[in-house]
Amino acid sequence: MRAFTRIAVVLLLVPGLVRAQSRPAADTLAASLQSRYQGIKDFTADFVHTYRGGVLRTQTQERGTVMVKRPGRMRWVYSAPERKEFVADGRKIYAYIPEDRQVIVSVVPADDQATTPALFLAGKGDISRDFTAAYADSPDPGTVSLKLTPRKEEPEYEYLIVTIDPVTLQIRALTTRDRQGGDSTLTFSNLQENRGLADKVFAFLIPRGVEVITDGTSK
């Protein structure tokens, strides 16, 4: 699977205040963010996914919608320029690109092994336990950003930068710095919480005639 596609399932968020002299410690904000999202049952949002840099110094932009339900359920649907889906039903994760006629199946990791931001949103992992937090420059006025560095080295990325609304603590953007020096940014809009999403929304039916890859083995 392409590196940009693999980054897609990597996503999360964090808090802050506008003025440096009045803001709490970064680790305190990280704990507040963890607490806030533990109280959210589900949410939906639109997103724009931009990738810049890396070995080939490329720039790519895609867009779509996301639905998340705790614990462990997600559906990322990319609509443009290419359709693809990433679905977690609580037990397994499915990555499907219709053009490739291929579905890649993996297991949702246990809470203490879930270090990607998307899985935190779905009720997996713990920000304070798994990351060290520090303030970072924020891309937009009226927002605050934190840099989250994993306590254990991750093969896919070096660190995350999460940008939030300092009043509501809602996510506005998430940037992932990958091991090739590229930045993958998810920018969120129209975020709505506690919609009462049904579990069936996160069911994935493998299409007929596609190649299914599980644990690196094709079927």
Language-model regions, residue ranges each:
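Bacterial N-terminal signal peptides that target proteins for export
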Residues: 1-8
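Hydrophobic h-region of N-terminal signal peptides that target proteins for export
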Residues: 10-20
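Short, solvent-exposed helix-to-loop capping segments enriched in aromatics
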Residues: 37, 114-128
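Amphipathic hydrophobic-ligand
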Residues: 58-64, 182
